[in-house]
Amino acid sequence: MSKLILILTAQILLLTATALAGKNGEDFARTINRKHLGLGKKEKLTHLRVYWHDIVTGRNPSSIRIQGPVAKYSSSSYFGSITMIDNALTLDVPINSTVVGQAQGMYVGAAQKEIGLLMAMNLAFKTGKYNGSTITILGRNTVMSKVREMPVVGGSGMFRFARGYVEARTKLFDMKTGDATVESNCYILHY
């Protein structure tokens, strides 16, 4: 009987040790075949041109200030301000042109001596072959520059594993309301 208890105890200890051996913190990661995620395909370069409509006025603004700028910088740089956006992306400059998606995210006044914004947004496409796909932009936007360049840091759907950049050019800016239309040329490498 004591031999049986000893054997059972040894087996329980062995099973417990085996179960715990996989919990050393290294079993959460593994190498997989690139082809399982569609990475065996040839990489493509896609150019998208959309117009981003930042509407801060009216009954249905698409851009809402969450936090105003620090008082010291309120008129010079907007430093410290936080604005959430759900801006229409259209095929042409007029806001009533065909909507192909939304720019959703935020911009933050991040510069003290100029109007320099930190842009963090997803361009979420709603039509055509890119319906349901997104690209993610995270970068600096010096609003007063004629052309601004921001990096594409990722994407989803058709733009999985995306990288690239966006060139932004202001097409319309209403000094009274603050409403703006920006042309965005997106150059995206993806599979």
From Swiss-Prot:
InterPro entries: Allene_oxi_cyc_Dirigent, Dirigent. Glycans are attached at N96, N131. Its main location: secreted. It is found in: Secreted, Extracellular space, Apoplast. Keywords: Apoplast, Glycoprotein, Secreted, Signal. One of its GO terms (biological process) is phenylpropanoid biosynthetic process. Residues 1-21 form the signal peptide. The keyword Glycoprotein applies. It holds the Pfam family Dirigent. One of its GO terms (cellular component) is apoplast. Belongs to the plant dirigent protein family. Homodimer. PANTHER family: NUCLEOPORIN-RELATED (PTHR21495). Dirigent proteins impart stereoselectivity on the phenoxy radical-coupling reaction, yielding optically active lignans from two molecules of coniferyl alcohol in the biosynthesis of lignans, flavonolignans, and alkaloids and thus plays a central role in plant secondary metabolism. This is Dirigent protein 3. It comes from Arabidopsis thaliana. The gene is DIR3.
